[in-house]
């Protein structure tokens, strides 16, 4: 394995916190870096966590890490309500994510992993604000031409402490009683999504990624993050 250092943006969110926990639990990454507005609620000798309230500085801090990360995971995301309106959400979910990707490319990051969303390029869905933000980031990452770019498109995220749509997420989360496949087609557990992101990054490093720009849809998230997951 040549991949030694990983960095995580969005390390305190639902999926990002699980990506961080997964990275700290396996031997593949002896060094893990994070930059966030508040420090993650975990500690490890492997972890270097930087608290920076000004997110505009995050991208530029990548090149200051030693050793420099060879893979960056971007799980940054918020809601319109939490951001205080669509304009502020756009600054975070679109502008900030693109800025971080550009900074990662300039810093020599080889593999960039982005947590996007399922169905965003559908005939109707592509015109929704959420989809426009995610599509913009996906396209920017593709244009940056990383050695490996990995886009995960999960469905509804299950297992969050503070669900964005508690009733709907509880309904989807309970569908496994009718059959795991039904639930898998609509939403995935946050831990499964995180493990799929890490597994895909490992595959890219091992030369096993199916393509340079790899879109991991829901079925492959379940396969990589649950059915075939190995620590």
UniProtKB/Swiss-Prot annotation:
Localization of this protein: Mitochondrion outer membrane
Q: How does it sit in the membrane?
A: Peripheral membrane protein
Its primary localisation, in coarse terms, equals mitochondrion
Cellular component terms per the entry's GO annotation: mitochondrial outer membrane
The protein's matches in Pfam families, at most eight in alphabetical order, are given as:
Epimerase (PF01370)
Name the domain of life: Eukaryota
Q: Please give the name of this protein.
A: Protein fmp52-2, mitochondrial
Source species of the chain:
Neosartorya fischeri (strain ATCC 1020 / DSM 3700 / CBS 544.65 / FGSC A1164 / JCM 1740 / NRRL 181 / WB 181)
């Amino acid at each position: 394995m040549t991949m030694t250092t990983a960095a995580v943006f969005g390390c305190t969110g639902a999926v990002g916190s699980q990506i961080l926990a997964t990275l700290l639990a396996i031997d593949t990454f002896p060094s893990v870096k994070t930059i966030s507005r508040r420090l993650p609620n975990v500690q490890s000798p492997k972890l270097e966590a930087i608290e920076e309230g000004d997110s505009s500085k995050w991208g530029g801090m990548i090149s200051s890490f030693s050793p420099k990360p060879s893979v960056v995971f971007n799980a940054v995301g918020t809601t319109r309500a939490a951001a205080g309106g669509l304009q502020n959400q756009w600054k975070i979910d679109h502008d900030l994510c693109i800025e971080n990707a550009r900074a990662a490319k300039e810093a020599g990051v080889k593999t960039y992993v982005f947590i996007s969303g399922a169905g965003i390029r559908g005939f109707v869905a592509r015109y929704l604000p959420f989809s426009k933000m995610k599509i913009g980031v996906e396209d920017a990452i593709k244009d940056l031409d990383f050695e490996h770019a990995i886009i995960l498109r999960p469905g509804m995220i299950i297992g969050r402490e503070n669900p964005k749509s508690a009733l709907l997420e509880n309904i989807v989360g309970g569908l496994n009683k009718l059959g795991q496949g039904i639930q898998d087609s609509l939403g995935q557990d946050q831990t499964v999504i995180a493990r799929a992101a890490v597994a895909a990054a490992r595959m890219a490093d091992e030369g096993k990624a199916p393509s340079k720009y790899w879109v991991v849809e829901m079925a492959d998230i379940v396969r990589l993050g649950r059915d075939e997951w190995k620590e």
